[in-house]
């Protein structure tokens, strides 16, 4: 699982960050692991990597935080994109046996609710 940053003028790769998740995670043919979109508000970049966690980066690609969401198990895999609102990163995961709606601080990854 990776997040990549490209230069908007020439398309050159500026940086790439990978997350390792060793367990097999279900996904669907029409919903691959890249279905969840990264989000930015001009201050941070946040990516949902499914069971590998929710991760915040700065614009240089430095990992600011990692939030462990636990193992997600549903036939369609991960497709929920995070939302940034004020100082919060809001994220929902489901359906499946383990569903959640959380908010973490977008700069630190600390759980707010």
Regions found by a protein language model. Give the residues of each.
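Noncatalytic, solvent-exposed loop/strand surfaces
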Residues: 1-113
């Amino acid at each position: 699982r990776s997040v990549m940053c490209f230069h908007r003028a020439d398309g050159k790769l500026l940086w790439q960050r990978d997350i390792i998740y060793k367990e097999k995670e279900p996904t669907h043919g029409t919903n691959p692991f890249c279905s969840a979109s990264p989000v930015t508000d001009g201050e941070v970049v946040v990516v949902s990597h499914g069971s590998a966690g929710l991760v915040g980066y700065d614009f240089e690609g430095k990992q600011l935080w990692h939030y462990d969401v636990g193992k997600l198990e549903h036939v369609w895999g991960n497709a929920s994109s995070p939302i940034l609102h004020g100082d919060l990163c809001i994220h929902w995961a489901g359906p499946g046996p383990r569903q959640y709606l959380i908010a973490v601080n977008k700069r630190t990854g600390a759980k707010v609710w």
